Amino acid sequence: MKNSLLFILLLFSTFAFTQTPTNAPGLEYVCELKVKLNPPYVVGETPHGLRRIIPIIGGTVEGPKINGEILNGGADWQIVRKDGVAELEAHYQLKTDDGVIIYIKNLGLRVATPEVAARISRGEKVNPSEYYFRAIPKFEAPTGKYDWMNNAIFVCTGERNPDNVSIKVWKLL
């Protein structure tokens, strides 16, 4: 009897731990940011890796939830680690088509082989399937129409193009 009970408990616990969670969050597409950049300022090698500051000089915001333009004046403060991974920390702002200014802080990673990273650095068009570029943007909007952006978690994919960075943003549901 004890062995049967132990077997049933073991079977149940194995079954319980192998089930796929049913409460995985969904995603809702918000917009695409096309961010224009100037050439980087290269600080050089630091204890953390190669520091680069990439000025953000403009761009567009298009999507079902928000539209507008990226304003001049932001930057991406990147560290390229010894393993070649670029740690991204971008701070910039957008202006919606109805005149609202929204601050963005975007933290992420771009992972590529040394060969792919060199092609990206030279400004070549590289298929985004050849590298991993993901980030977590945080929006800070004033009270009003875009206040919903203050109370949500977002994720994004990135694509480095020769003349911009394309960032597709989803709200985590």
Enumerate the predicted regions with their spans:
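Bacterial Sec-dependent N-terminal signal peptides
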Residues: M1-T22
